[in-house]
């Protein structure tokens, strides 16, 4: 038999079936059952502490809520679409289990502040998982950097060979990106984990409630300052989705490089078979599908952020039913982020880099040309003059189809008589790396400092 609407006292007609289906949220917001139960238990305890309910009533409520949680987790809970959402389903079931005391749970509370609390707890719980996954991924980048700190490859600008860099420097660049993501998620969580319970529908309540007790019970960082803002605020969802968008953007940049580097024309990286697929017609193919799919999933996360911004655009105070649409963008994004971070961590740990291919690519692009220009400056040329002279020497090497370091001293001196035999030491790629001693540079000492700094931060 269909359940009566808990709000249905002033209505004489039942809700049309298509409307019931159209307006329900139970099909997806039941994901928040644990947060809803935790919030209700804290609320019930507060009502007892304030003398609004008896200790016996509070105990009944708490035991009933525990029973409901067990039913949900054993897949025996009777979800009912006519009860619309997770909140009403749980409250109705509570009354079935413990009788009319269950009807007292909602004292001093509205679904408006209840759903805001549930969603804040859900977002907070899950972005905390993002943070842990990011820390794991950073640790793998740091470990790979240690493994390949003596490996040199072309650094690129405009996707053209530019200067030699340590592979460790390249990998650590991503570690620093994801470190910023950790910081963003942490700072976001400070604003997410603020309790709105006690705001009621929009204007507060006449009951002698204690919002600070509830916040403390739920390990929140504070309580709301304005009841109207508390029930209508979804900035925290937007902020979490922005954090997710930046995380996915960073993942997509690394995915793009894995895709390019795994191309035989580069051959810098060997993708594990477990993270690649083949072709239905071309038996030789090994496609970087995992990286491509992850790169493609960025669009759905960006879309979720834009979705939320649009939902809130021009929305008047306070609660409007539009806000029901705030859940699915975050739910979908949360699934995408957690799966992407998990798969990237496993894939990165299994990847091997081709040192020989990277070494051979250095000579193809005359990546030690900047070293030659700097060398000429030490011989008394202005940088602009050194730049022009180096360009002429590169042209000579191109004409002979050899790397700079294979030119003879006579070849060098035919263009600039200030060049001496010590030029060959300067043109060595390992020397080039070591000479980059500036803060944050690709020099070996800088690499060691970066690794130490990140390791120290990861253990804090």
From Swiss-Prot:
Similarity annotation: Belongs to the lyase 1 family. Argininosuccinate lyase subfamily.
PROSITE patterns xrefs: FUMARATE_LYASES
GO molecular function: argininosuccinate lyase activity
Native source organism of the sequence: Lawsonia intracellularis (strain PHE/MN1-00)
Locations listed in the record: Cytoplasm
One GO process term, biological-process aspect: arginine biosynthetic process via ornithine
Pathway(s) where this gene product acts: Amino-acid biosynthesis; L-arginine biosynthesis; L-arginine from L-ornithine and carbamoyl phosphate: step 3/3
Keyword annotations from UniProtKB, A to Z: Amino-acid biosynthesis, Arginine biosynthesis, Cytoplasm, Lyase
Name of the protein: Argininosuccinate lyase
Cleaved signal peptide residues: none
Reactions this protein catalyses: 2-(N(omega)-L-arginino)succinate = fumarate + L-arginine
EC number per UniProt: 4.3.2.1
